[in-house]
Amino acid sequence: MKIHRLYIVIGLGLTLFATSCTDRFEEEENNEPAWLGPNVYDYLEQRGDCRYFCQLIRDCGYYESMKRTGSNTLFFSPDSCFETFFRSADAVNKGYTSYDKLPQSMKYMMLRSCMVENAQLIERLSKTDHGGTLFRRTTMMELEDTIPVVTYADMPHNIYFDRYKDGEMKLLMDASPWTLVQFFPDVMSALKITDKDMKYICGDGASIDRTYLFQSRIVRQDITCKNGYLHELDRICMVPDNMAGYIRNENRLSTFNHLMDRFCEPVLYRTTVDGERIYELRYFNESVSHPHRTDIDGRIAPGMLYFDPGWNLYQYGSSGTNSNNAYEGDMAAMFVPTNEAMAEYFSADPNAEGHDIYESFGGSWDNVPDQIAADLLKNHQLSSFVNSTPSHFGTLKDMAGYDMEIKEDNIVGSYVARNGIVYLINKVLPPLDYRSVMGPVKVDQGLKIFNLAMGDNYCQFQYYLRSLKSTFNFFVTLDEYMKDYLDPISAGYSGVRMNSIYDFRLNTNTNTIEAVVRNAATGDSIGINTSGGISGALTSRLTDILNQQTLVGEIIPGQEWYITKGYAPIRLVWAGDKVVAAQGAGNASPIDVIDEYDKTNGATRYLNGILRTSPYSMYNILRQHAGASASGSVDDKFKAFYDMCEYCGLFEKNPTTTCAAIDYRLSFLSQYHYSAYIPGNDGVEAAIGDGIIPSISDIENCSLTSEEETAGLDLEEKREMLRQRMIRFIRYHIQDYSIIIGGQNENEGQFLSSTLNTTTNKFYPIYVDQDGSNVRILDNYNYQRRRQGLSFEKVDVSSELNNIMARDLIVNSAATTAATGIETYSYSVIHLLEDGKYLRFE
């Protein structure tokens, strides 16, 4: 092979050299090796059975390139293949019954779509430039070689195309380059495609030892010419439609296509110099690679597929640009039910699997809501062809993580598109039916861990979620993503167990939940957390997850922060009025919402990860900003406040003899959620200067006390009196309820501080504004001044330090290293007050 390549290079070089040294060229030409054939064009012409292909080359302007210059790879077909094509039903319907009836655009497509840059053997075509497996490659087909002019009758019938009822449009099925799909022996070996797979991909008799381009067999390969290589096909070289195009044009799939038409729209590709608009067809989809979540008017899509089935350069899970080469190694797969299968599913027959949907929506697919239709459609999409071939059917999972329940005898046909394979199947793979937010968890085979966790043997959460009088937003994590859970209890452990990571899994033998415990730093397994039955330790952690991932009440589009059932703050990421991701205070980045179901009592949203709580206590955060963190201080803005708390003994380790804080906690916090408004060092100094509180040195020296106040008190009692004044000041800066910038709007919402009014025996109030961008506080002192008609002021939180999330955790053992569960906890959101400010209660 190396020798052949060398002669090709020599041959090409000599051809170029002829322009400057004719006699030398002629001398070398006479010494060409016997195996080196003529140029590409002459070879085809001399065969005598490639008249159509030679004419194609001439008509498309490639005569000189194929005869004299260039470095070409060409897939060609003899005349017999053209004659077969002219007699085909598709060609007859389009009027292509002879060569002279082919439009120029069709000729360009026939030639350029089977041309590849540079001269390459089949073996070389199987490899990327970096030596990887090359399953798909682009062709020399120009995107605008053929642009269909579509009338309204042939457009998808939906609201996005209705504006074109009275006209026509130039509509590309996709605006990315076309690709060839190479079922070459080296490729199939690398991708572990079997003979059995090939039977369903390319038909009976197909073998991994043979070479195929799409579903066309290469009957003769590596034909060597002076200026390139030729590979002969057993049928005319026509790049197939993409998946969406095939489904649209295949009569047996018209019902499925009718539903899919709801979720596409024309998007402007470009405007020509003549002002003519060219559009491309886009499908609404939620993929990371090539998402299309809003329509051209900026509205949230009525429903979304997992990916765009029309994207020629389909690639799943990469950065998703048309120049990214991630498409080379794989393509998509779609399992599309035939019309007969759809009718059998969606039927008046009470035994039909889709009978309930049929009854609910009047027996018409047109009445089925967009979201349900989208759920049904995308349940038939898989991100990887390679991982969904028939040899994988026994373990095949859909993109929500549960079994596809597909068998080989369900396949009644297949079509290799340029961006994926379409399997025609004789059954519908339906969405899950449910009423409450836990319904999907009850029936979804991909949510077995959550299903068990909600049940009687673990957290008994099902009784709570059954309430139809409440509104829930339930964020559930699929089994395959029930991993990388940072165990909050393990922060109190030592050695390799400290800060453990849990990967939950199902023990199918005992129908219980286990967790592989890993070291966070190394990722190494350090054991399996289970008792062989129902583990109390796991129940504690699962309860924490369920509480963290359940919102009670309505959610408002645009509002970012919410407080969960377990008092944890979580952030929602919106795209218009749709939640596209969620983030716990302990997550480094948002967790994608990969599915959503609206139910009677709320919504169920699938996550591809576990929402984490903050790993830091309030003590830890104050210490970090007091120049005293063991891991290195961030700054010292909280130093004065931290020093006061520490001096007053407000940080405690063991609230009781049977439990302990992970590090330290504020002693007066209960199991609830709070806001802490921390005066900076200058704010504390201002309070001291205004005589509101004593300094620590004042307390030690018993300053700022009158004889009347301290009559009869000894020195320590005097200090304690001053210390209590400082404690009451500290406690007034911490209120019940977490106020978060970006959370629920407040307009002088009244909340209770942690400082008790000993006269009324009620806690002093704090009045708070929160408008999505700032928190402003009216303390009780200024509130009373306003009531009296006096001047007053509100205090803003700092734009520099705010929305800092903390969690004070108490575990069920006096020794944190022996803890197995969570005893109690509190959540806090910490804000620094603006420079020089503090809060007064009187």
Regions found by a protein language model. Give the residues of each.
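Sec-dependent bacterial lipoprotein signal peptides
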Residues: M1-C21
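Mature, structured domains of secreted/extracytosolic soluble proteins
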Residues: C21-E842
